[in-house]
Amino acid sequence: MTQLLSARAGEITPEMEYVAKREDLPVELIRDEVASGRMVIPANKVHAAGALEPMAIGIAAKCKINANIGNSAVTSNVGEELEKLHTAVHFGADTVMDLSTGKDIDNIRRQIIDKSPVPIGTVPIYQMLEELGGNIEDMNAQHFLDMVEHQAKQGVDYMTIHCGVKLEHLHLTVNRVTGIVSRGGSLIAKWMMAHNKQNPLLEAFDDLCDIMREYDVTWSLGDGLRPGSIADASDDAQFAELDVLGECTKRGWEKGTQVMVEGPGHIPLDQIQMNIERQIEVCHGAPFYVLGPLVTDIAPGYDHITSCIGAANAGMHGAAMLCYVTPKEHLGLPNEEDVKQGVIAYKIAAHTADVARKRKGAQDRDDALSKARFAFDWKEQFRLSLDPETAQRYHDETLPQDTFKSAHFCSMCGPKYCSMKITEDIRQMAKEKKLVELPTT
């Protein structure tokens, strides 16, 4: 039984109970959202029996973030990837994808799954291509089915599979500025061009569902034709694929499998709401998992910023999970520090989306930190911040002594120009002179 089938049968699984506590929501609501397909609980039966702490992705839950790690053909090793995993989870990643494309993929993934408390996602075509010697033209559907089953047996919780790219879509990409930017999408496109046949992953969809259902692997329907520049945003190729993903969503549900859908990409700020609403309609409310989106293309080295602007907007309008972008995007393989910066940027984006959507308790931490700020409780401010070490380090750069951790000013304004200290003085004066009736707190 998958989480979806259990929910449809009216059953409440241990994973649903765990999620309900984490989300502070009624367990019956969790069950009903999973049953409807609006929520997924990525929990491969193998991983669920090990280190996994179940979580939920869906419009009724808090907005989640994913961090990508993984080696490449030219850099990184098992130790570095495990350090990235630890950093990502420590700073708040809700899921992690292992996108390794280099050597030792199996060993890296096995160790990541063994040590990860969060769901692990993969793109199976990467390892399959490595085992085919890099020649996608040599692939057949059975190669892919075997790889999906192999990774499912290892405990992978969700898989990005590019079923939506069709042969008849490819001509729609000819005039794009950046063409096909999805690695998986471009590989499938190349295979279709070489063989003049339809997408073999789409043809094998029902067989893939059988594997996903056996291990309760969640579909992450890949957007192989996502725009890779704002010039290509919201074009015919993107939306032609989206229509197919909507059909695949229903087919996946009919087969008893959990489904979420991936989205763009590079989208101007004014088009984000339309994109989210269109996806929700076309894909029947399935959780939307977006990469960014980046809202401008002119800031290599700062794309964690260009993208978290779009991500916050996407989350506010209904995206259920945000895939982080690091400062290294478009430039190179992220290191541990890049992972940290990407996760923090996206925790900010997801949190602001939760506040905007008025999710239960979302603003409590903001209010607590604001009260600590007004009370000049520096240690409490550090504790409540997303990155306490950095917050304290910045304060220590100019006022390192312990005495300044109780001072009623910082180095920005000093003791005479602090507006909050002046406000404190005004309130005290008003009390003494009884100019206004102030409530006691």
Swiss-Prot record:
Catalysed transformations (reactions): 5-amino-1-(5-phospho-beta-D-ribosyl)imidazole + S-adenosyl-L-methionine = 4-amino-2-methyl-5-(phosphooxymethyl)pyrimidine + CO + 5'-deoxyadenosine + formate + L-methionine + 3 H(+)
UniProt key word Iron: yes
A GO BP entry: thiamine diphosphate biosynthetic process
Keywords, alphabetical: 4Fe-4S, Iron, Iron-sulfur, Lyase, Metal-binding, S-adenosyl-L-methionine, Thiamine biosynthesis, Zinc
GO cellular component: cytosol
Cofactors: [4Fe-4S] cluster
Binding site for Zn(2+): H266, H330
Gene Ontology molecular function, alphabetical: 4 iron, 4 sulfur cluster binding; carbon-carbon lyase activity; zinc ion binding
Cofactor descriptive note: Binds 1 [4Fe-4S] cluster per subunit. The cluster is coordinated with 3 cysteines and an exchangeable S-adenosyl-L-methionine.
Keyword check for S-adenosyl-L-methionine: yes
EC number in record: 4.1.99.17
Broadest EC class assigned to this enzyme: lyase
Binding residues annotated for [4Fe-4S] cluster, in chain numbering: C410, C413, C418
Known pathway: Cofactor biosynthesis; thiamine diphosphate biosynthesis
Protein family: Belongs to the ThiC family.
Annotated function: Catalyzes the synthesis of the hydroxymethylpyrimidine phosphate (HMP-P) moiety of thiamine from aminoimidazole ribotide (AIR) in a radical S-adenosyl-L-methionine (SAM)-dependent reaction.
Protein known as: Phosphomethylpyrimidine synthase
Gene name in the database record: thiC
